[in-house]
Amino acid sequence: MDYKLIATDLDETLLNDEHQVCTENMKWINKAVRERGVRIVAATGRGYNQILPELTQIGLNDQPDEYTISYNGAAITENKGFKMISWQGLDFDKMAEIFAFGVKHDVCIHIYANEELFVYHVNDDEYKRLTAQKLACTYFEEPSVDFLKGKRIAKILFENTNTDYLKSLAPLMKDMTEGCVEVSYSSNRYMEFNTLGVNKGTALAILANKLSIPIEQTIAIGDNYNDVAMLKAAGLAVAAGNGVDDVKALCDYTTQADNNEGVVAEAIRKFIYHEDI
């Protein structure tokens, strides 16, 4: 298969544990773009304006006719000037309902609104992570989101390093999420909420259609549950070697490399350059 587009998750997939693109990934991404004309699309749960250093590292920042999938698929933007191609945000009242639930259940809460990140009840571990990622955000402790009324809401998420605890919340939230909210998990610490039907997979399909690339000629690379829809949608699904077992099980290929060793580089070598790995 002649693959034309690679959509890759960022955290724990393209990026190493220092939140950087490793040399091996940069080398093979640049080679594939330059020699084979492969499109590289960052597909992230973060906001498109929060990944400029990463886009810069792979030569895609502020480039025309290059695109980013962000907020788990709520937004598709052209990298040049952040031109919005697609937007499917979360209703404010639904976000507020989920927030109120989270306040009562001992979680840190992230809200993405108007291209900004607001973080409620941050804990020490999450503060260190956000600082390491160099994410600009506003911290708050007042258990109210009234100050966000009128803002465009992308998504909301809960943070707790006990993923079993996060998953135990899902049945308690069934009445408020069923039929209207897409729930996913990422980074072994986040429980994420988007509008129903919004995910990286639907966004990949929208973008591939815009670019007149058959979905069969796309590769998706990821490590966690919020990548599942994208991995299922793509023509070829690649799991990071450090990915969760459920994700590996549904993929066509799992890299030998982990995110510190060049997951994306290995996928390019094997499926674009057809090297024996």
Where do the model's predicted regions map?
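Mg2+-dependent phosphoryl-transfer enzymes with acidic/Ser/Thr/Gly-rich catalytic loops
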Residues: 1-5, 23, 192-277
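A generic "binding-loop/recognition-motif" signal
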Residues: 47, 72, 115, 189, ...
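Asp-based phosphoryl-transfer active-site loop
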Residues: 2-19
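Hydrophobic packing residues within well-ordered alpha-helices of enzyme cores
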Residues: 51-55, 169, 173, 231, ...
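Short, structured coil segments at secondary-structure junctions
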Residues: 58, 64, 72, 176-179, ...
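Active-site phosphate-binding/coordination module
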Residues: 25-126
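Conserved acidic, metal-coordinating active-site core of Asp-based
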Residues: 101, 105-221
